Amino acid sequence: KGFDFLGFNVRKYGQKLLIKPSNSSIKSFLESIRLEIKKGISTPVARLLSSINRKIVGWANYYRHVVAKKVFDNVDSAIFHILHRMIKRKHPKKSAAWLYRKYYTHRGMRQWMFIAPYTTNHGEKRIVWLKKAADIPIRRHRQVISVATPYDAEWFDYFDKRAKKMSYLEQAVGSNAFGLMRV
């Protein structure tokens, strides 16, 4: 069964040790999304979507270093269904075709992408898209060479190159801050 620690489930499957998001953290995240939607049923959908997008990106960035791709897909599907039920409740007399035209679009091979059109204060028409956790790339932790130490002068170049590479690769999706400070 493994154990849960800081929202992660650490478990051995056969000969492999896999770290995944724990079921309790997934449930609490989806519950927070449900509550956000319930609270914001009367707010404009664009504002609600941008609030949900911030939560999705933050949650996915936290779990992006572990085995989480299938979990991200399942979370995206659950959020989509929660939002779909919300708009059906919000517009009970409208047809499915009307709902599709107003709240969904397609881009490339992706269909049924949830959107919320809005107008800015300057009169510009814009669209907010529902972000998907599955779009955030999984990045594994790069292991440090076991004999390397940042306090030894002969390894300074190694840690400089590593810091530059990591700061580029490990930057959190959706933020401007680097994920790794220079050593």
Sequence positions of predicted segments:
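Non-catalytic terminal/accessory segments
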Residues: 1-183
